Amino acid sequence: MLGLNHTSMSEFILVGFSAFPHLQLMLFLLFLLMYLFTLLGNLLIMATVWSERSLHTPMYLFLCVLSVSEILYTVAIIPRMLADLLSTQRSIAFLACASQMFFSFSFGFTHSFLLTVMGYDRYVAICHPLRYNVLMSPRGCACLVGCSWAGGSVMGMVVTSAIFQLTFCGSHEIQHFLCHVPPLLKLACGNNVPAVALGVGLVCIMALLGCFLLILLSYAFIVADILKIPSAEGRNKAFSTCASHLIVVIVHYGFASVIYLKPKGPHSQEGDTLMATTYAVLTPFLSPIIFSLRNKELKVAMKRTFLSTLYSSGT
């Protein structure tokens, strides 16, 4: 898959949370509970959309696919992090490190692309309702979903290939809980490291900023159309279909901007690790909560699905 350059070292050591030895057991239990809740919440959303025929619409199809991407993203990161919290042996093979970076970036960017697609879906539903069935046909939805996954895979491949073509020398300790770009760049040596760092940074920022601007543009048109609705009840009903998606977008990009766009200055590695953990663990944890609480139709359907599952298991 990659022309990996590992002439200087064959494995890395994930330092992770070694600076917090007294907190590792507590962090393990906390992250394990959040991880299990993330999996169960997203699986419940998927089961509900699958079982309720009234939810077989593009909006809930995209939500279901978003849940898949969140499950895969957390699976790519959190199990390894949990294992390291209980272990003193935190080495990770070169190929395993590259694989973790590829999958985490692929599913992370797929998540961003799907949020953009969901924004477009809401724009079409509110601003062009008469053309909705044409623009959001099954074939069109499949194309949007396929492009999101393909785009995420391409981004993961581009970033991983660029980083692991570098030569790594000196220390093999990654000052992070996963194989991430900034700490790996600190271990790389060679004249091309600054160019690779700049290129990878620009590609990631342009992709994420492009998604964010498209979402903003969609909501600019949505708000403009909602304000034209004469009744307050109509405006509230129209906006309620967008509220959960908008909150998830704010949480997703809010945490990402705090972590990746914070000004460079004197700050501890421990602080960076905790902030990155917030993004990797807390964001997927909050997403199913927001969608299930803010979407009345989904909330009612989830209760019905959950109760029917309990009843069938009880009998």
Swiss-Prot record:
One of its GO terms (biological process) is detection of chemical stimulus involved in sensory perception of smell. The keyword Transit peptide does not apply. Keywords: Cell membrane, Disulfide bond, G-protein coupled receptor, Glycoprotein, Membrane, Olfaction, Receptor, Sensory transduction, Transducer, Transmembrane, Transmembrane helix. The chain crosses the membrane at residues 26-46, 55-75, 100-120, 140-160, 198-218, 239-259, 273-293. Disulfide bonds join 97-189. Glycans are attached at residue 5. Residues 1-25, 76-99, 161-197, 260-272 are extracellular. PANTHER family: OLFACTORY RECEPTOR. Odorant receptor. Belongs to the G-protein coupled receptor 1 family. This is Olfactory receptor 10H2. It comes from Homo sapiens (Human). The gene is OR10H2.
